[in-house]
Structure formats: C-alpha cells, structure tokens
Swiss-Prot record:
Name of this protein: Armadillo repeat-containing protein 3
UniProt KW keywords: Autophagy, Differentiation, Lipoprotein, Palmitate, Repeat, Spermatogenesis
Subunit-structure text: Homodimer. Interacts with PIK3C3, PIK3R4 and BECN1. Interacts (via ARM domains) with ATG14.
ARM repeats: 15-54, 57-96, 98-138, 140-179, 181-220, 222-262, 264-304, 306-345, 346-385, 388-427, 429-468, 470-509
Pfam families the UniProt entry points to: Arm, ARM_ARMC5, EDR1_CTR1_ARMC3_pept
Function summary: Essential for male fertility and sperm motility. During spermatogenesis, promotes the autophagic degradation of excessive ribosomes, providing energy resources for mitochondria and thus ensuring sperm flagellar motility.
Ranges of Low complexity composition bias in the record: 626-635
Length: 872
C-alpha cells in the first residue's frame, strides 16, 4: 500500500472579504448600511429601519435627521424585489410625518411610488405604496403630483384588490384626490363609480365609510349623479339606511342622498320607488341627532329645485320639518330651519307653516345659540316675504320683541334676517305701528352702523318700511339715526346705496327731518352720486328731488324749475342759476353781504312786524301777510263772486308807473279803471303821510333781531309790506272767482301792473329795469331785494311774483327758468272748445301765461307764440 500524501488547503483569494457578523444597536449605523452594494445588507437594513420607524413619531424624525430618506428613495427602484419591498414599506410608515412628506415632495419620488402599484407587484408592496400615497395626498401639492403622474388610474384598479388594506388605502387616497375638481372629472372618465359602490358591500366599516364619503364628494357634480343613478347607487344607499346594524353609516349615506336629490331625475326615481317616503320617515323617527340633521340637509339641498319642492310638498315634508324643529339638538334645529327656508318658495308650503311652524320658529329666536336664532330668522324672513298672512302670524306669536332684540346680535346674518322680517311686517300699517311701539327706531341704529354691506342694506330697507309717519321719523331723528343713514349714501355697494337713498326719500317726507338730512350733507352726497353714471339710481334721484322739495330755493337755483306742487313759502329766495356742485349760500349770509355787481337775490317774505292799516276791510277773513297755500277751503260761491265783482282789485292795487297803452280786453278795462281809481286815492294823501309810510317801509326792510336786548337773538329776513299787501289783495279780490281761467288772467294782469305794466315787444330794450334794481340794491344796502320792492320787473321778476301769489290762493302753476333773464309760468287748463261735446273729457293742455306783452294771455305750450315768449 502506497504512502498517503497530505493534501494542502488552498488559501482564500486575496480579493475576497472575509464574512463579518455585525450587531448594531444604533440607527445611525444602519442608515449607513443603506449605501451598501450588497442586496442582503440592504434588505436587512431596510427591515431594521422599518421596525424602528413603527415605534413612533420621534423615530421617524430621527431617521429624517440621520439622512435616511434620500438613500431610501433610490432603493424604490432597486432591482432586488425584497429590497424594493422593504423600502416601500418604510415609506408607507414615514410618509405620515409632515417633515418627511415635505422632503419627499422636494425629491420628487411620486413617480417611483406610483410605479409600485403595478399589477405584477406583490400585495405587500401595493399595501404600503398605497399607504404612502394616502398619507401624501392629505396636502394639496402632493395631490397635484399624484394626479399629474397618473396615480388615479392604478388606485382605482386597486379598489378591486383582494386585500382589504390595499382597498382601504387606495380609497382613502382617492377620497383626498377628489376634493379637487380635475380629479373628479378624471374619475368619471375612468368609470370609478361601480368599484366604489362595490365597496359599500365590504365587511369592513372603515372601507364602507370612506366609500360613502367619496361618493358624497363626487355627487356634487351632475355627471357623477347621473352615473350613480345609472348604476343603481341610490338602491345601495337606501339599503344602508334600512339596515339598523349599519347605523354608523347612516349619516354619510344621507349626505350622499342629499347631493343626489339635487338631480331632478334622481328625485323622480327615488320618489317612484318609495325611497322619498322612507327618507322622510327615517328623518322623523330617528333618535340620532346627526342623522336627523343630515336628513334635513338633504331636504334643503333638494328643495332648491322647484319640481323637487313640489314632490316634497306632495309627501307632506312640512310635517317632518316642524317635528325636527322640536329636537333638543341645536344642529337639527338649524338644519330644519334651513329646510323650511328652502321650502318657502312653494306657496303651499308657505301656507302650511302659517299655523304650524311660525310659532316654533319664534320660540327659536329666543335660543341661547346664535346660529339657531340666525337660522330661525332666515326661515321667518322667507316665510313673511310677500305673504301678509304669515307676517300677521309672526306678530300674533309675539315675534316682534325677539326680532328687535335680534338686531343687536353678534352675527351679521341674524341681524339681516331680523331686519327683513320686520320690513315684511311693516308693510301692514297695524303691524308697523306695533313695531314702532317696540322702539324699532332706536334698535335699527346699530345695524345702520354695521360694517357688513348686507346688514347695512337690510337695515336701510327697514327704515324705509317703518319711517312712514312723522312720529317715527321724529324718533329716528332724535335717536341719531339720520347720521349713519346719510353715511350709507357714500357706500360703494349698489344695493346699500339704493336702499339708503330710498330711506332718505321716505325720511324727507317732513320738513324738520328733511332739513336735518340736508344739514348732515345728504343733499351734497346725493348730488355727487347722481352725477356719476354708474353710482346713481332711481332712488338716489328721487331722494335728491324730495330733499330739494323741502329746499325750493336750492331746487330752483339748480334745476330752474318748480312744479305746481312746489309751494313757495316765506323765506324763499331766487339766487339765480348755480352750477352742479356749487353751494348755495344761506339767506342770512346773503343778507349780510354788501351790495355788489352780482345778480340781485329776490326774496319772498310776507311776514310783517306791524299791524295792517285800519282802512282794510274784513280783517277777520284774512290776516295781514298771512300765507294761503290752498284755495280748497276758501272758494266762495258764485253768488258771493257776483256780489263782490265790483271790486276785483281793491285799494292799493295800482302801479306807480302809468300804463298809457290801450287795454286789449274787457278785463283790462276793469283793470285800467281800478288802477285809475287807486291812483286817485293815492293822490288824495298828503306828502307827509307818503314820506312817513316810506320811512316805515325802509325801517321794516332792515334785518331785525327778535327780542333785542335779550341774550337770545334770532335773525329775521327783511320784511316786505308791499308783498304782504299783494297777498291780502289777491286773496280778497281774485280768490273768490270760481272760474280758474279768469283767476289766472286777472292774477296775470295784477302782477303785470305791479311790475311796470304791459310792455310792447319793441319797447322792451327801453324798459330800464336794471337801473331800478341797482337803485334798490343801493337803497337797501344789500343784494337781497324783497319782491314787493320791485316796481319795474321783467320776465323772471314777474314769473316769480305770479308763482308766489298763485300758491297763496291755490292756483296750480309751475315756474320755469329760461335763458337771458327769461322765466315763465305754466298752467294746466281744460280746452274750452271741447265744452258741450258728448263723451269723456279730453286731457287738459299746458299753457304759458303772458305777463309782459299781453298780460293775462294764455299761449299753448310749444306753440309759436309761446316759444317767442320763452326764448329770445
């Protein structure tokens, strides 16, 4: 046997590293291993990091600080399946940390994560990749990245996965994504509704809940509602409601149904299948407040469609809603009130709530919960709009007091709704008086000062409805309510400006309030508003005109027109034309100015400080200088007229300037005779008496202070004894005439005589009225001239005097300012040529009165002779 030779052991290759077993207890060491080229090391390191991250948020932060995220992102695309799986699992856990999410967005790993959703990947990878996406999708930027990288389609596919965790994570991610409109539209393209509906059958409540929430969101879109209907989605939802064991899903199921009911076809379908009745019964009989609340919300959403309201009314939804008002849960009360608000568009529902509903809503106005009070007020606002019966019902239920208390609420919506209800109530006079007795004018001031434009608008409208009588306006004025109302005229909001203008127009109904509004600057603000083509409205123009009607001096200066309803009273003055935006100086300031070259200011003032002459007859009938604005109670019978016809013009009617022209009519003959008689009467007086009268008149012209010597001095405008005499004379002589045309003609002749008589057209340039006016200004030491002092007047002097006297005896006439010193009066008269014609009376016609060339002549408006009179 041969000798055994010992085999030599070959040494290991020099380039091979001997195996090294390492046991590490530091996360930092394991993080370093993530850069290893060995797949086994990478897999074990990832597994260790996964276990470490599962232990809590602090560990996730530690891994982030150690720089583990960036090398892990590279492992998502590793060739080794185990490494890739473990890395994906880590990101599923880490992505719940906000700082990690932020870093992942910066590293743009979304494409790599979505790639893990491929069908060929393991279920575990699907689970953690979808978990990562679910965590990431909670933020908007990540949603965009998921959508842009095509993540929606694989997520929808995974809804059919056999693994419940994959379904849950995918559904959660989809729910987050569909909050964005683009994703919802894409969802319809991908036909995602059938797999989502299938998840409603899942044995896991969390999956069912996520599916319902997702359906609730996508059902906001019409196309999605159609797809739900076509896929029998409502049947699934109704089954859930009918299953008591699924009561934890009822709230979300109702939310989906609420959105679906906005679709008319869906509404019809659910009604035909009996689902609507089940829904109402479910809402009324459920003991869970949130279910009742969501049921009421479903009704509210659906009730915005008129056909849906009709169907609800047929199903007697009103009874259900009234029952829900009695719930102990505030959320249910709010939802029921909102549903009633929506159903109010149906007239039948409105009538039903008259007896049942309004009393309960009034009680809710007293709730401690501000939101409940607001919702109840909204329902009452809709119930009482254009419905006097419901407004009465609210008042009978003692609703006025809580509504006025609600005006001081902290919620703007509650204030606006309460103001609306009060406005609706105030449309009826008995209710308006009741509201006024509850101190509405004081309570509305705070809403008028609100910064909310809706509240401002509704408050101004409430003022419009409640300030319809003097007492209410006085209370508003005394409470300081006019100031915030005037400020609202400056609002940039069209609705606020319109309603504030309307309120100002109503408040300007009495002189004191109108004057206070003007003092606060309402007239100036409205003038500025009306200049703007975009800011003005019909109410601002009407309010401006209403205020001007209480300041006729300003109105005539600005507009050059006074209508027959604009009655000239003492204190009126004609300053002449002023441009828009120019401020008209007050009379006192004008009186205290020195004479100048400016146009004379004509003053109307019949008030006097002396008694009338003892020679005047019938002192008891008409007081000296008394203002008469209406002739309705002063008309004499025709018998009296004939009896007194012999003195149409009594003593003092003559003119200091002789009229040498021949009279043009019989009436002028009477005038001439009367003038001659008066002239003779004047000549019989001695020079001393004339001088004495002149001195007295001059003394009376000087502005006086009442109660001189006392500390309280009141300025008075210059008196005008001549004008006082005119008023007395026309009242005695012209007022008794029963024929309106004769009245106008006689008054025209009277005015002409007092202003220098008839003037032939060719002699008009020689009529030296300017010198006369200048002499008066010098004599009175003022630019303000009482109208009675003017003895040589032209068009605008005579037209003003005619209007002032006509207003005293009830002759309706307008005053129109023309160009170059022209002015004229217009009257409305029946055409005499139609007398005796059978049939209805024709419309009266407008005439211009001749006060210059043929005093008393009447010319049809826009006729050639009238145009020659009005225009140069």
């Amino acid at each position: 046997m041969g000798k055994k030779i010992k085999k030599e052991v070959e040494p290991p290759p020099k380039d091979v590293f001997d195996p090294l077993m390492i046991e590490s207890k530091k996360a930092a060491t394991v993080v370093l291993m993530l850069n290893s080229p060995e797949e086994e090391i990478l897999a074990k390191a990832c597994e260790a990091i996964y276990k470490f991250a599962l232990k809590g948020e602090e560990n996730k932060t530690t891994l982030l600080e150690l720089g583990a995220v960036e090398p892990l992102t590279k492992l998502l695309t590793h060739e080794d399946k185990i490494v890739r799986r473990n890395a994906t699992m880590i990101f599923g856990i880490l992505a719940s940390n906000n700082d990690v999410k932020k870093l992942l967005r910066e590293l743009d790993v979304m494409n790599s994560v979505i790639a893990q959703l491929a069908p060929e990947e393991e279920v575990v990878i699907h689970e953690f990749a979808s978990l990562c996406l679910a965590n990431m999708s909670a933020e908007y930027t990540s949603k965009v990245q998921i959508f842009e990288h095509g993540g929606l389609e694989p997520l929808i596919r995974l809804l059919s996965s056999p693994d419940p965790d994959v379904k849950k994570n995918s559904m959660e991610c989809i729910y987050n994504l569909v909050q964005d409109f683009q994703c919802r539209a894409k969802l319809q393209e991908l036909n995602a509704i059938p797999p989502i509906l299938d998840l409603l059958k899942s044995e896991y409540p969390v999956i069912q809940l996520l599916a319902l929430k997702t359906l609730g969101v996508i059902a906001n879109d019409k196309e999605s509602r159609t797809m739900l209907r076509d896929n029998q989605g409502l049947d699934h939802l109704i089954k859930i409601l009918e299953t008591k064991e699924l009561n934890d899903l009822h709230i979300e199921a109702l939310a989906v149904i609420a959105n679906c009911l906005e679709d008319m076809d869906t509404m019809v379908q659910i009604q035909q299948t009996g689902g609507l009745k089940k829904l109402l019964s479910f809402a009324e009989n459920s003991t869970i407040p949130d279910i009742q609340k969501n049921a009421a919300k479903a009704i509210t959403k659906a009730a915005y469609d008129p056909e849906n309201r009709k169907l609800f009314h047929e199903q007697e939804v009103e009874k259900c809603l009234v029952a829900l008002l009695g719930s102990e849960n505030d959320g249910t009360k709010i939802a029921a009130s909102q549903a009633i608000s929506a159903m109010c568009e149906n007239s039948g529902s409105k009538d039903f709530f008259n007896n049942q509903g309004i009393p309960q809503l009034i009680q809710l106005l007293k709730s401690d919960n501000e939101e409940v009070r607001e919702a109840a007020a909204l329902a009452l606002a809709n119930l009482t709009t254009c419905n006097p019966a419901n407004a009465n019902a609210a008042a009978e239920a003692d609703g006025i007091d809580p509504l006025i208390n609600l005006l001081s609420s902290k919620r703007d919506g509650a204030i606006a709704n309460a103001a609306t209800v009060l406005t609706n109530m105030a449309m009826q006079e008995p209710l308006r008086l009741n509201i006024q007795n509850h101190d509405i004018m004081h309570a509305i001031i705070s809403p008028l000062r609100s910064a909310n434009t809706v509240v401002q608008s509704k408050a101004a409208l409430a003022v419009t409805a409640t300030a319809c009588d003097v007492e209410a306006r006085t209370e508003l004025r005394n409470s300081g309510g006019l100031e915030p109302l005037v400020e609202l005229l400056r609002s940039k909001n069209d609705e606020v400006r319109k309603h504030a203008s309307w309120a100002v127009m109503v408040c300007a109904g009495d002189e004191l309030t109108a004057n206070e509004l003007c003092r606060l600057g309402a007239l100036d603000i409205l003038e500025e508003v009306n200049v703007s083509g975009t800011r003005k409205n019909k109410f601002s123009e009407a309010a401006y005109n209403k205020l001007l009607n209480n300041n006729l001096s300003l109105k005539y200066s600005q507009t050059g027109y006074l209508s027959s309803s604009n009655i000239i009273n003492d204190g009126f003055y004609d300053y002449g034309r002023i441009n828009p935006g120019t401020k008209l100086l007050p009379l006192k300031e004008l009186c205290l100015q020195e004479p100048s070259d400016l146009r004379a200011v004509l003053l109307i003032n019949s008030k006097s400080y002396v008694s009338p002459p003892s020679s005047m007859e019938d002192k008891s009938d008409v007081g000296y200088g008394r203002s008469i604005s209406s002739s309705s109670s002063l008309r004499r019978s025709s018998k009296e007229k004939n009896k007194k016809n012999s003195y149409h013009f009594s003593a003092g009617f003559g003119s200091p300037i002789e009229d040498k022209s021949e009279p043009a009519s019989g009436r002028n003959t009477v005038l001439s005779k009367s003038a001659t008689k008066e002239k003779g009467w004047r000549k019989s007086k001695g020079k001393k008496e004339e001088e004495k009268v002149k001195e007295e008149e001059e003394v009376m012209v000087v502005p006086k202070f009442v109660g001189e010597g006392s500390s309280d001095k009141e300025w008075c405008p210059p008196s005008d004894p001549d004008f006082s005499m005119y008023v007395y004379e026309v009242t005695k002589s012209i007022l008794p005439i029963t024929n309106i045309k004769e009245q106008i003609e006689d008054l025209a002749k009277y005015v002409a005589e007092k202003m220098g008589g008839k003037i032939p057209k060719e002699k008009l340039p020689d009529f030296s009225w300017e010198l006369h006016i200048s002499e008066l200004k010098f004599q009175l030491k003022s630019n303000v001239i009482p109208i009675g002092h003017v003895k040589k007047g032209i068009f605008y002097h005579r037209a003003l005097l005619f209007k002032a006297l006509a207003d005293r005896i009830g002759i309706g006439c307008s005053l129109v300012r023309g160009e170059y010193g022209r002015a004229w009066n217009e009257v409305m008269l029946q055409n005499d040529s139609r007398k005796g014609v059978i049939g209805g009376l024709p419309a009266p016609e407008m005439y211009v009165i001749d006060l210059m060339f043929h005093p008393g002549g009447l010319m049809k408006l826009r006729s050639r002779e009238a145009d020659l009179y009005r225009f140069i």
